[in-house]
Amino acid sequence: MLKSGDRFETFILSIDSIHKCINRIKQDIISDTDLKGVHTLWLYELLKSPTALTAAQLAAKSNIDRSLVSREVKFLIDSGYLSLAEGAKQRGYNTRLQLTERGRDIAEKIALSALAVQESVGGCISADELLVFYDVLLRISDNLEHLSRDGIADVSGRIAAGE
Protein backbone atom coordinates (compact mmCIF):
# COMPACT_ATOMS: atom_id res chain seq x y z
CA MET A 1 0.00 0.00 0.00
CA LEU A 2 1.25 3.49 -0.82
CA LYS A 3 2.16 5.88 1.99
CA SER A 4 0.57 9.34 2.08
CA GLY A 5 3.56 11.09 0.48
CA ASP A 6 3.89 8.36 -2.13
CA ARG A 7 0.18 8.64 -2.98
CA PHE A 8 0.59 12.37 -3.58
CA GLU A 9 3.57 11.85 -5.87
CA THR A 10 1.89 8.96 -7.72
CA PHE A 11 -1.31 10.96 -8.16
CA ILE A 12 0.40 14.13 -9.42
CA LEU A 13 2.78 12.31 -11.77
CA SER A 14 0.04 10.03 -13.11
CA ILE A 15 -2.43 12.86 -13.76
CA ASP A 16 0.29 14.94 -15.41
CA SER A 17 1.33 12.00 -17.59
CA ILE A 18 -2.28 11.27 -18.56
CA HIS A 19 -2.83 14.93 -19.46
CA LYS A 20 0.28 15.00 -21.66
CA CYS A 21 -0.69 11.74 -23.37
CA ILE A 22 -4.22 12.98 -24.05
CA ASN A 23 -2.85 16.18 -25.57
CA ARG A 24 -0.49 14.20 -27.83
CA ILE A 25 -3.36 11.91 -28.89
CA LYS A 26 -5.60 14.91 -29.64
CA GLN A 27 -2.83 16.45 -31.75
CA ASP A 28 -2.37 13.16 -33.60
CA ILE A 29 -6.10 12.94 -34.37
CA ILE A 30 -6.22 16.45 -35.83
CA SER A 31 -2.72 16.57 -37.33
CA ASP A 32 -4.06 16.80 -40.88
CA THR A 33 -6.21 19.86 -40.04
CA ASP A 34 -5.65 23.45 -38.96
CA LEU A 35 -7.33 22.73 -35.61
CA LYS A 36 -5.85 23.00 -32.13
CA GLY A 37 -6.23 20.41 -29.40
CA VAL A 38 -8.58 22.70 -27.47
CA HIS A 39 -11.06 22.54 -30.37
CA THR A 40 -11.53 18.77 -30.17
CA LEU A 41 -13.77 18.72 -27.10
CA TRP A 42 -15.96 21.55 -28.41
CA LEU A 43 -16.51 19.83 -31.75
CA TYR A 44 -17.25 16.56 -29.93
CA GLU A 45 -19.72 18.31 -27.59
CA LEU A 46 -21.51 19.90 -30.54
CA LEU A 47 -21.67 16.53 -32.31
CA LYS A 48 -23.31 14.77 -29.37
CA SER A 49 -25.64 17.65 -28.49
CA PRO A 50 -29.17 17.37 -29.92
CA THR A 51 -29.29 21.17 -30.22
CA ALA A 52 -26.89 23.96 -31.09
CA LEU A 53 -24.76 25.21 -28.17
CA THR A 54 -23.54 28.66 -27.19
CA ALA A 55 -19.93 29.67 -26.59
CA ALA A 56 -20.84 30.07 -22.92
CA GLN A 57 -22.12 26.48 -22.81
CA LEU A 58 -18.97 25.20 -24.54
CA ALA A 59 -16.85 27.12 -22.02
CA ALA A 60 -18.77 25.62 -19.10
CA LYS A 61 -18.63 22.07 -20.50
CA SER A 62 -14.88 22.28 -21.10
CA ASN A 63 -14.02 24.34 -18.00
CA ILE A 64 -12.22 26.87 -20.21
CA ASP A 65 -12.37 30.65 -19.98
CA ARG A 66 -15.23 32.15 -21.99
CA SER A 67 -12.99 34.73 -23.65
CA LEU A 68 -10.70 31.99 -25.01
CA VAL A 69 -13.71 30.06 -26.28
CA SER A 70 -15.07 33.20 -27.93
CA ARG A 71 -11.77 33.88 -29.74
CA GLU A 72 -11.41 30.29 -30.86
CA VAL A 73 -15.06 30.09 -31.98
CA LYS A 74 -14.32 32.96 -34.35
CA PHE A 75 -11.50 30.87 -35.85
CA LEU A 76 -13.77 27.81 -36.11
CA ILE A 77 -16.45 29.84 -37.90
CA ASP A 78 -13.96 31.56 -40.21
CA SER A 79 -12.38 28.16 -41.01
CA GLY A 80 -15.72 26.57 -41.85
CA TYR A 81 -16.06 24.15 -38.92
CA LEU A 82 -18.92 26.00 -37.22
CA SER A 83 -21.73 28.28 -38.26
CA LEU A 84 -24.26 30.36 -36.40
CA ALA A 85 -27.43 28.40 -35.74
CA GLU A 86 -30.40 29.17 -37.92
CA GLY A 87 -31.93 32.51 -37.00
CA ALA A 88 -28.83 33.83 -35.18
CA LYS A 89 -27.97 37.34 -36.26
CA GLN A 90 -24.72 38.12 -34.47
CA ARG A 91 -21.89 36.41 -32.62
CA GLY A 92 -21.71 36.55 -28.85
CA TYR A 93 -21.52 34.30 -25.80
CA ASN A 94 -25.19 33.38 -26.13
CA THR A 95 -25.33 32.90 -29.89
CA ARG A 96 -26.10 29.28 -30.72
CA LEU A 97 -23.44 27.48 -32.77
CA GLN A 98 -23.71 24.39 -34.91
CA LEU A 99 -21.36 22.16 -36.83
CA THR A 100 -20.98 22.63 -40.56
CA GLU A 101 -20.53 19.57 -42.76
CA ARG A 102 -16.77 20.06 -42.48
CA GLY A 103 -17.08 20.37 -38.69
CA ARG A 104 -19.31 17.30 -38.47
CA ASP A 105 -16.81 15.24 -40.49
CA ILE A 106 -13.91 16.05 -38.16
CA ALA A 107 -16.12 15.72 -35.04
CA GLU A 108 -17.10 12.21 -36.14
CA LYS A 109 -13.41 11.37 -36.64
CA ILE A 110 -12.70 12.70 -33.14
CA ALA A 111 -15.56 10.63 -31.67
CA LEU A 112 -14.41 7.43 -33.41
CA SER A 113 -10.82 8.03 -32.33
CA ALA A 114 -11.91 8.70 -28.74
CA LEU A 115 -13.83 5.43 -28.69
CA ALA A 116 -10.83 3.55 -30.11
CA VAL A 117 -8.55 5.07 -27.48
CA GLN A 118 -10.98 4.18 -24.68
CA GLU A 119 -11.24 0.60 -25.89
CA SER A 120 -7.48 0.32 -26.26
CA VAL A 121 -6.52 1.65 -22.84
CA GLY A 122 -9.49 0.16 -20.99
CA GLY A 123 -9.47 -3.24 -22.63
CA CYS A 124 -7.79 -4.95 -19.68
CA ILE A 125 -10.10 -3.31 -17.12
CA SER A 126 -13.45 -4.86 -16.23
CA ALA A 127 -16.70 -2.91 -16.60
CA ASP A 128 -17.12 -2.94 -12.80
CA GLU A 129 -13.61 -1.57 -12.28
CA LEU A 130 -14.28 1.19 -14.82
CA LEU A 131 -17.49 2.18 -13.03
CA VAL A 132 -15.62 2.44 -9.73
CA PHE A 133 -12.75 4.30 -11.39
CA TYR A 134 -14.98 6.94 -12.98
CA ASP A 135 -17.00 7.35 -9.79
CA VAL A 136 -13.85 7.93 -7.75
CA LEU A 137 -12.30 10.14 -10.45
CA LEU A 138 -15.38 12.38 -10.54
CA ARG A 139 -15.40 12.68 -6.74
CA ILE A 140 -11.70 13.56 -6.68
CA SER A 141 -12.25 16.10 -9.46
CA ASP A 142 -15.16 17.71 -7.59
CA ASN A 143 -13.17 17.83 -4.34
CA LEU A 144 -10.15 19.38 -6.07
CA GLU A 145 -12.37 21.92 -7.80
CA HIS A 146 -13.82 22.97 -4.44
CA LEU A 147 -10.35 23.22 -2.89
CA SER A 148 -8.95 25.21 -5.81
CA ARG A 149 -11.90 27.60 -5.65
CA ASP A 150 -12.19 27.93 -1.86
CA GLY A 151 -8.52 27.59 -0.91
CA ILE A 152 -6.66 24.96 1.07
CA ALA A 153 -5.88 26.96 4.21
CA ASP A 154 -8.65 25.27 6.22
CA VAL A 155 -7.66 21.78 5.05
CA SER A 156 -3.95 22.41 5.64
CA GLY A 157 -4.71 23.71 9.13
CA ARG A 158 -6.74 20.60 10.01
CA ILE A 159 -4.00 18.30 8.71
CA ALA A 160 -1.31 20.20 10.64
CA ALA A 161 -3.46 19.90 13.78
CA GLY A 162 -3.69 16.14 13.28
CA GLU A 163 -7.43 16.05 12.62
Where does each model-flagged region fall?
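C-terminal regulatory/oligomerization modules of transcriptional regulators
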Residues: 1-4, 128-163
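Alpha-helical linker/hinge and terminal dimerization helices associated
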Residues: 15-18, 22-25, 29, 62, ...
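N-terminal helix-turn-helix DNA-binding core of bacterial DNA-binding proteins
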Residues: 24-68
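N-terminal leader segment of winged-helix/HTH proteins
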Residues: 1-33, 79-81
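Short, hydrophobic-biased segments on the C-terminal half of alpha helices
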Residues: 55, 73-74
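Charged, amphipathic alpha-helical coiled-coil/dimerization segments
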Residues: 74-135
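N-terminal positioning helix adjacent to the helix-turn-helix/winged-helix DNA-binding module
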Residues: 7, 18, 38-41, 95, ...
